[in-house]
Amino acid sequence: MATATSGSGLHLEAIDRIGSIPLVESSVKRVETIYDKVKNNNRLFSWYFETAEATISAAYETIQPAVKLFEPSIQRLDNVMCKSLDILEQRIPLVYLPPEMMYWNTKEYMSDHLVRPVLKRADSVKQIGNAVLESPLTTYAAERIDGAFTVGDKFVDKYLVPIQTDQDQTDVKKLVSALNDNFSPIRQQLNRMFGHKSPQEDDNEAVPDERGAIKAIHHGQRFSRKLKRRLTQRTIAEARALKKQSKEAIHVLFYAAELIATDPKQAVQKAKELWVYLSADEPENQARPATLEQLIVLLTRESARRVVHLVNFSAHVAANIPRNLAHTTTEVAHHIIYINHRIITISRLDKVKTISKEEAESLFKRMLAFYGSLQGLTNAYLERVASFLSGRMEAEKVTGSDGGNSNHRSSRRRQDPNHYSATHNNINGVY
């Protein structure tokens, strides 16, 4: 079982036994071959993989001491895996055969147990199918299905009119031939099962001397080919129309860019005309689009019209916002004033209102007086600082009398009470 080798780390017998399985061994060799090819492809890959190998080796050497701690548990796991491999070898010995032998054995087993029973069952189904096809109930159902296909042919001729164009016919023949090549094995298998040949590959002509279920099956095949052919023609025509429309759109864009670069005024005029056209309401009783190109043009035009209407509506709303806001604010203010007046009238708070008004006016007057005195004091100090900085203090010392009178006037100006409700218009000491 599991044995430990000195100097090379822990050795697992289960890994060796799994590697000795032919299928695993061949897979490992194949992977090694691919790895060597990728590694030796160029120098960058070689350096990258060598660095990765060195890193993995260093990591393996680093974790060796930690692995030694779990050696008993790993050995028990190795024993369990070896016992599982013994059971696998006893029950499925095919696993230890070479891959080629496994392939041939599997092929023989599938041939004996799957393919031949299926072929036998298909033969019996063929016989049962012939019996079922000849029953009256099947004949009745086939007639009804054939009638449904006939009605389907009429609808196809009405709504999917063939497009008579040489290039279209060439492309349609190529696509239909490709589709018929894809479905030909199924058709051949059905013909072999029911013992009849396929109908002619014409448009919609029935093969003579047909009846019952075979006639319904062949009619369904013709209807399927016809429907595929008409749908392919219509798809190609719509694709060409879209291609043509795309070219025209690109030409229009180039013309618009050239017009903007050469004549901006005319470009602006064209843009205004287009905007006015798209700003109009959608016309009523429009003709339904007959082709995909017309449908795309209609959807594009109406989508642009919706966008223009949205932009116009947003601009109108944005332009009316200031006026509406002012009107709403005025209305709210009037309502608030009216509500306050009603509350005061109902609560009989007229005296309180008058007292509050007088107190507010008195407080406002005191604030104005304090502000005026503060402004005068500030102006005086600013004048003294300015005089000190300009050297006027020396002049005041020499001319004491003039300075005394000036100081007396300044002190008188500072001590004069403010008997007015409004403040003086004093700015930085200038009166």
UniProtKB/Swiss-Prot annotation:
GO biological process, one term: lipid storage
InterPro entries in the record: Perilipin
GO CC terms of this entry: cytosol; lipid droplet; protein-lipid complex
Compartments where located: Cytoplasm; Lipid droplet
Alphabetical UniProt keywords: Cytoplasm, Lipid droplet, Lipid transport, Transport
General function of this protein: Required for normal deposition of neutral lipids in the oocyte.
Annotated family: Belongs to the perilipin family.
Protein name: Lipid storage droplets surface-binding protein 1
Organism name: Drosophila melanogaster
